[in-house]
Each structure stands twice: as C-alpha cells, then as structure tokens.
Curated annotation (Swiss-Prot):
Gene assigned in the entry: mraY
NCBIfam families: mraY
Entry GO MF terms: metal ion binding; phospho-N-acetylmuramoyl-pentapeptide-transferase activity; UDP-N-acetylmuramoyl-L-alanyl-D-glutamyl-meso-2,6-diaminopimelyl-D-alanyl-D-alanine:undecaprenyl-phosphate transferase activity
Species this chain originates from: Mannheimia succiniciproducens (strain KCTC 0769BP / MBEL55E)
Pathways per UniProt: Cell wall biogenesis; peptidoglycan biosynthesis
Full protein name: Phospho-N-acetylmuramoyl-pentapeptide-transferase
Membrane spanning stretches: 21-41, 73-93, 94-114, 132-152, 168-188, 199-219, 239-259, 263-283, 288-308, 338-358
C-alpha cells in the first residue's frame, strides 16, 4: 500500500523512492509486525482472559501440562493480524502472490478459529469434526491452488524443482494441483501437531519463513536464479515481504509464548502458519526443500503416523506418547530442554536446506 503512496510522493521529493527497495520494505515489514505484536500482545491476553478463552488439556497427557489448563489460547489472532497489517502496508498489492498467501493464511486462520472456539465452548480437545475440518482446509487450499495454476500454467512456475539436480525440472501439468494440495494441507497439519509445547512451533516457523525470504528473493531475481539453477518466477520477490512479516510476528508472539507461556497460539495460529509456509513453498517451487527445512514438523507428523499405525497393526506403541515431543517429556526431559533442542535441530535443517541451493 505504501509503495503506491511513495510513488505518488516521489514527484515532490525523490527520497521517497527508497520505499521501492525490497530490502528496505522487508526490514520494515519485519519490524512493523514485531512492534505491533509487542503492543497488541498484553491487550489481547487480557481480552482472552476476560472472555475465558482458556486452553483445554488432554487428560492422558503429561502431568506437567495440567498446570497449563486455562492459559489463554487463540493468541494466533495476534499473529494473523500483525502479518496481515504489515504485508498490506509494505507489500506491492498489485502482486497476485501476496493475495494467494494472505488468502490461505486468513482462510486457514478462520477454520482454526472455529476449531478453537468449539474446544472452548464444549470444554474438550475435540474441536471441529475431522471430516468438516479437512473439507474446509481442502476448499480454501484448492481455491488458491487453481488460481496459482491458472496464473503460471506451462511456465517455470509449475515446474518441479528437485534438490541436488540442476537439470531435473519437469513440467508438472495438472499434477501441480495434487502436489500443491498435499504440501499446503500437510504442512498446516504438521505445524498444528508440533504446537504442543511453549514456543515449540513458532521458532521453527520463524526459521523456515526467514529462509524462504532468502529463497523468494533469489527466485525473483533473474541473475541469482540463473546462478543457482533454480527457475526464475516473476512474482516471487514480493513474497519476501510476507515472509519477513511472518518472522516479525513470530518473534513478537514468542515474547509472550516462551516458557512458561502467557498465551498459546491455538489452531487459529498453527493451521494458518502451516498453510502459509506450504503456500510459499509451492509458489517458489521448493516443496522438497520445505521437507528438509521443516524437518521438525515432518518428524512430529511421522511420529504420529507411526504410533497410530503400530497400534492398529500390532496393538503396541512405538513411543510413550505422540507427537514425539511428548515422548521426551515422559522420559523425564524438562519442557525447556525439549523445546531448545528441537529449535537447534530446526536451525540446522534450515541452514542445510539453504546450502542445498548451491549443491547442484
């Protein structure tokens, strides 16, 4: 929004052209989201307490979690608000990739809000009925995906990029829709599963979003994309603004979500952030890289799949409890130790993912 205003003001003072610089806007997008979060946070936490929007806790979970019962939840509303405001302020709103990303973020946020509200209203951890939850997640993602496919059909925007192989970039055709669907919905649910400890999900999200800011910049630059043997995609550079807004909002939320948490993001935050990361990965054509950089999310999801599969087939559990972060809690690890070690793993995977851009 401010890009258009600055262009108008340039005729009166040339210094306003600094707003057109992507690096300038990306830093301000991060700072705007961060400072807004720090300002809004205490007010939102008080409101959530007044409305009695408290977290429900599983009765079969670790005993240390019982003290979390009643902690304000749905703090993800703060994350969504600050990301949206920051992106609208500093992004080029003529860029369709900005709107695809915001659509999934807010659409998934709305689904998460209903899910959280039902948990609070009925005082259980069930939320939305699973089939309806996946119906709405699927509908939102498919609307965005078909728009993305129509915009980039038969161009580099619908090619498959395979890490380590610079010559393998097949045109996906309609399989793009299938792949994008599983990436967006899958990532959304993976982040949701990871969000079980104070700050556990938000910091890996910040790491991955920060890395995608770099990748979006490279993909939207003709020379850099050519140098790295990745496809040049016209609209991706503006995703840097969206990614840095996520980083700022995430760090601002972590201020209140760090152990012991004053507020939880709830499904309104985790489903939305996961959907946003999946959408970014699809738009910059780095779905495989998301699997690497989001390895903590993958690990959490796989642990649940293995646990459920093992119990159904053998009537035995592999882990003491799934997702796997609860397994380590039940082994006696203090919650902060689990969180920090998972953060370290996430950072290592993100750095390795960035290195693979050159290993081709």
């Amino acid at each position: 929004m401010l890009v258009w205003f600055a262009k108008f003001l340039e005729q009166y003072y040339s210094g306003f052209n600094v707003v057109s610089y992507l690096t300038f806007r990306s830093v301000l997008a991060l700072l705007t989201a961060l400072l807004l979060s720090l300002w809004i946070g205490p007010k939102m936490i008080r409101r959530l307490q007044i409305f009695k929007f408290g977290q429900e806790v599983r009765n079969d979970g670790p005993e240390s979690h019982f003290q979390k019962r009643g902690t304000p939840t749905m703090g993800g509303l703060m994350i969504l608000a600050t990301i949206t405001v920051s992106t609208l302020l500093w992004g080029d709103l003529s860029n369709p990739y900005i709107w695809f990303s915001l659509f999934v973020l807010l659409g998934y946020g709305a689904i998460g809000f209903v899910d959280d509200y039902r948990k609070i209203k009925y005082k259980n951890t069930d939320g939305l009925i699973a089939r309806w939850k996946y119906f709405w997640l699927s509908l939102v993602s498919l609307i965005a995906i078909f728009g993305m496919y129509a915009l980039g059909k038969d161009t580099d925007a619908t090619r498959l990029v395979v890490p380590f192989f610079k010559e393998i970039m097949p045109q996906l055709g309609l399989f793009y829709v299938v792949l994008a669907y599983f990436v967006i919905v899958g990532t959304s649910n993976a982040v949701n599963l990871t969000d079980g400890l104070d700050g556990l999900a938000i910091m890996p999200t910040v790491f991955v979003a920060g890395a995608f800011a770099i990748i979006a910049w490279a993909t939207g630059n003709v020379e850099i994309s050519k140098y790295l043997y990745i496809p040049y995609i016209k609209y991706t550079s503006e995703l840097v603004i969206f990614c840095t807004a996520i980083v700022g909002a995430g760090l601002g939320f972590l201020w209140f979500n760090t152990y012991p948490a004053q507020v939880f993001m709830g499904d309104v935050g985790s489903l939305a952030l996961g959907g946003a990361l999946g959408t970014i990965a699809v738009l910059v054509r780095q779905e495989f890289l998301l699997v690497i950089m989001g390895g903590v999310f993958v690990m959490e999801t796989v642990s649940v799949i293995l646990q459920v599969g093992s119990y159904k087939l053998r009537k035995k559990r592999i882990f003491r409890m799934a997702p796997i972060h609860h397994h380590y809690e039940l082994k006696g690890w203090p919650e902060p130790r689990v969180i920090i070690r998972f953060w370290i793993i996430s950072l290592m995977l993100v750095l390795f993912g960035l290195v693979t851009l050159k290993l081709r």
